[in-house]
Design a protein with these regions (language model features):
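Elongated, mostly alpha-helical coiled-coil "stalk/stator" tethers of large membrane protein machines
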Residues: 1-169
């Protein structure tokens, strides 16, 4: 919806400010932390609703976020998540989708800072082509066997950039 689109735009501005001047490792760490928060929110509807409820006080949300994630993510990620919780969302799941998008963009920024963005783009394209051309690969990737999927992706991406592995996984 319209609220989530506006919030996505505001979120990207905040992410750009967060990665401006950062080194590749810091941008990649931010990506990992945003993926972590998105994963927690994707599996916990109550937390997701608490963070997207427009009737909840911003200070209460910030305290909740700090309590929940303060020891698990860095200050930059904590600040971004707090800021995102203050925005309007058309649906609670939109916050998760935007967090995942920001995590991808942070990892792309890390690759760009490291001078590897073209390589990462090529590797992702090659991996996507491999997945698209193989029914067996697609079946393996859609199975519930997480360890088997991780091993398969690692085998396919052997020698690939760390950013590529993170983004494809």
């Amino acid at each position: 919806g319209g609220s989530s689109r506006k919030s996505l735009v505001a979120s990207r501005v905040s992410l750009d400010a967060a990665v401006k001047g950062a080194d590749a490792n810091s941008a990649s760490a931010l990506s990992s932390e945003l993926f972590f928060v998105a994963d927690v929110l994707s599996t916990n509807i109550a937390v997701r609703r608490a963070l997207t409820d427009p009737s909840r006080d911003g200070k209460a949300k910030a305290a909740f976020i700090s309590e929940l994630f303060g020891k698990k993510v860095g200050g930059v990620a904590l600040g971004l998540v707090t800021e995102l919780s203050s925005l309007r969302w058309s649906a609670p799941k939109d916050l998760v989708l935007v967090l995942e998008q920001l995590a991808i963009e942070a990892e792309a920024s890390a690759a760009n800072i490291a001078g590897e963005l073209d390589r990462v783009e090529d590797e992702i394209f090659t991996a996507a082509a491999a997945f698209a051309s193989s029914t067996d690969l697609r079946k393996a990737l859609t199975s519930d066997a997480t360890n088997a999927k991780a091993t398969l992706v690692a085998d396919i991406l052997k020698g690939a950039s760390g950013s590529t592995v993170k983004l494809v996984s």
